[in-house]
Structures are given as C-alpha cells and as structure tokens.
Amino acid sequence: MMTAWAVLGGFVLDAIFGDPAWLPHPVVYMGKAISRLEKFLRARLPKTPQGELLGGAVLAFCLPVGTLLFTGLVCWGAAMLHPLLGLAVQMFWCGQALAAKGLVQESTNVYAELKKGSLPAARKAVSRIVGRDTEALTAEGVTKAAVETVAENASDGVIAPLLYMLLGGAPLALTYKAINTMDSMLGYKNEKYLYFGRAAAKLDDVANYIPSRLAALLWIMAAAFTRNDAKGAWRIWRRDRRNHASPNSAQTESACAGALGVQLAGPAYYFGEYYPKPTIGDPLRPIEPEDILRADRMMYVASRFALAWGCAIRGFLG
C-alpha cells in the first residue's frame, strides 16, 4: 500500500511542479555517469567491434545495477529512520521519474511559436525535445516532430516509469530511467555507436516491450475519451506498430497517428546523417499545430488511466 501512495504522490508532484530547472535531476547525473564510463571504457578496451561490444555491455550492466543499488539503499535507509521519511523519498523520486508536465510544457512552447509564425523559434523549441536535426524543418516538420515525441514519450516518460514504480517503487523506476537514458545517448546505429551502443539499445528494447504496448492500448482508450478517432487509432496501431527500427517506438506513435488522422514519421536527419524511415499512419488531412495540443490531452488521459488502474491493483495486492 505504501508503494501505491508513493506513486500517487509522485504523480501529483510531477503534475504540479514538473521538473524545475533549479532542482538537480537524477537523469542529469545518469548522463554524466554514462559519459564518464564511456570515456573510461573506450580508453582501456581494444578499438575493435569486439572491444566496443564488450565496453558497451559493461556500461549497460554497471549503470542500471548501480542505480538500483544506490536508490534502493537510500530508500531503505530513509524508511529505517522513519516510515514517513521513506515514503517522502519515494514520492520525491517517483515524481522525478515522471515527465508528463515537462513534456506538455515543452510541446506547448513549440505550439505557441508555430502560432506566432516564428519558424526559427519553433525549430529551436522542438530541438529541446527531439533528437533529429531541426535546422531545416518546415512548420509541418516541426509539428510532426513535436507530436511524435509526445506520443513516444507517453510511453518512455510516463507509462513505463509508472509501471516500474508500481512494481518496485522509485528504485526500479529510476533504474528504468537509467536504461532509457543510456539508449538516448548510445543507441545510435552510426559509426561511433554501432557496436558500443548495441547492448544499451537491446536492453532498452526489453525494458520497454510491455510498457510500450500497454501505453498504445491506453492511448487508444484516451482517443475515445478525448473525442479523437479511437477506431482509427486501433486500425493504424494494428497496421503500423512495427514501422520502426525499434520494436517499441512505433507503438504509441501509430496509435496517435490513427487517432489524429495524420501521417507521422518518415525520413529524418540525425547529426547530419540521413535516416530513411517508413511513415506511420495515413495523411487523411494535413497535420496542424493544434495536433500538438490534442496529443498532449491524449497523453494526459492515458497516464491517468494507467495511474488509476495501477494504484488500484497495487493497493489490492498490498
């Protein structure tokens, strides 16, 4: 029952405060640890495919295990001092593991700049939440990028952390965030990370396999509750959910594309390199800035479904 309260409290904290810039965030420290471990391992292992595979595997083992042990020890120590202190620490970290409000704030900034007609500012705003190159994006491209990242991060930034914190509290949720951060930094199929980032990418695929599919189903339900096209969401999800190199990334994107009646994904540039990617959804109408707000609403509704059912099940199980 304490875990359910910690999750509920963390959700409320994220909904109210988001991720204040002045407050240190665990993902920042995870990123620094990844960079330092990568530098350390690359300097000491052979610069061969086998050496890079080994180095990436060592990093993919050390960071999640270290995160789980450290956060678990802190939560245990706090609970030993006083149960309410343990609950407070869990709530705080659960809130930091969620990214719903931050995602909505950033995507809304993109929407605001598009409505002003300021394409350079919109490109800059969307560059804060996507990994692709944004310098040459059209207004339609900026809108697509924002909608796609809301859909994908509904799983990575909200539903998946919720699932893991319901299973194992803040320590397991932050361990998931460590895995997700590794994939964000290392999981590229370019010359630098083709071998070194493989273990991180595969681990992220495993960690997101169930959450991404659950998130897609919740998104389809949210489409019905927000007066979007739930039937279209179901149809496009069934058809296009595998239209991505990752087995998970197209799950919520396809549901979102179908719910909105637009086409997402397609080719993009990353770090100056062209990546051909299949499209997701049918272009029943042109995408428009308001689709960013529609995606935000569906993400919020889906996350509340996940919270309500997850806490109810967790509370029932004890």
Model-derived regions, located:
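Hydrophobic alpha-helical transmembrane segments
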Residues: 1-175, 179, 187-318
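Glycine-rich phosphate/dinucleotide-binding loop and adjoining beta-alpha-beta core of small-molecule
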Residues: 184
